[in-house]
Amino acid sequence: MNQSLLRRGYWFWFKYEPNLFWYYSIPTKHANIILVYLLIEMFSRVPAKSIARFRCVSESIHRRPDVTEQSLTKSMSRPRLLFALEVNKDLLFFSSPQPQNPYDNSSLVATPYKRFPKYLPTRICTTLGGLVFLQKWLRKKTRVICNPVSGDYITLPKVKATGVGESYFGFDPITKQFKVLCMTWSRYGTPNTHQVLTLETGKRLWRTIQDPILPHYRSFDRICINGVLYYGADFEESQSSKIVCFDFRFEKFSFINIADEGMFRGSYKWTLFNYKGKLGAHQYSRNGELVLWVLEDAENHKWSKSICILPPIVHNSRIVGVTGTGEIVFSPYACYMPSPFYIFFYNIQTKTCTRVHVKGFEEFKHNFTLLHTFLDFVEDTKFM
C-alpha cells in the first residue's frame, strides 16, 4: 500500500469500503481524478448540513461547480421550511422538511442551523434560494447576505448617494446571478437614480443603472419570481398605485396596472406571493374573508380574483406563501414557547385546513419569540 497516499488522507475516506482497496495501486495522476469522482458521489448521498461541515477536509472540492450544482439540484427537489427566530436580540435559523401532502395533526421537527454573530441585522427582507438578505435601518443602513446552512455571511459595501432607501434581493435564473437593487434618490422632482450590486463579481461595487423612474414610495410587500422583482408603489405625480417590476437580468423597470381602483385600497394589508410561477396578491380582513388576485397576463395587465372564507383557526396567523400544489400556508406572528407552535395549510379547492405541529423550539422556554416562516427554502452549500 502506497504510504504517500495514506499520508494525504486517502485511507481516511475509503477504509470502510473493502472493495475499493485496489485504488491504492494506481498512479497518483489517475488517483486524483478517481478521488474527486468518489467525493462527488459521497456528497450526493449526505444532507446539505453535513456537506457544509466537510469543508474543513477539502475546500477545493466544495468549490467545484459540479459539486455545488449537484447539491443544489438535490435540495431544490426537496424544498424545506425555514424558521427564523428572534430570541434576546439573536437571530436563529431552523429548518424542517416541507410537507407535500400534510395531514391534520401531523408533526415536523425543525433542526437548528449555525448561529451568527449578535451584531448582524435581525430584520429579514428576503429569502432566496439558500440565502437570506438582512437589513438594519436606523442611521447606519447595514445590508448583510447570509447562508444559514454554511454559516457564511457578507456585509455589502456602503451605498454612496444623497438619499438611500429600500434594498431588494433578487436572482436571475438565466445568468444564475444574485443581485441587490438599492433605491436611491436625488433632489425632489428629479428622476430617481438607483444602484445595483452583483454578488458573484470578485470586487463588489454598486453601480448606477441607466433606467431611472419617477419618484415613488413602496407601499407594501415585495417578491422576486423568475428573475423579476415586484413591489407595490404609490406615485405622487399621478396619485396612483401600481406594481413596479424590475428585471434583474436586463436591469430595467416596468409597471403593471392594478385590476381596479379598489384593489389596493388599504394597501398596507396586502401581501405578494408566488402562485405557481405567477404573481399573486392577497388582502386578509379580520372577518375571515381572504381576497386573492392572480396576474394571469402581465403584458395586458389582466388579473383574476377569488374570495375565500377562512376558518377561525387561522384568524390570528398570517399568510407566508403558497405551496407548489396551491395550498395557502399560515403561520403565527410570534409564539410563547411553552405553547405548541402550529402552521396551517389551507386548500383553496377543497376548502379544508390542515394543522401541523412544528417541534424543535423547546429550548426557548418562557420566551416570547418573534418567528418568521418561509416556504421553499433550498439548502445551498456554495461558498459566498
From Swiss-Prot:
InterPro entries for the chain: F-box-assoc_dom_typ3, F-box-assoc_interact_dom
A Pfam family recorded for this sequence: FBA_3
Domain F-box, chain residue ranges per copy: 28-74
Name the UniProt record assigns to this protein: Putative F-box protein At1g53360
Organism, scientific name: Arabidopsis thaliana (Mouse-ear cress)
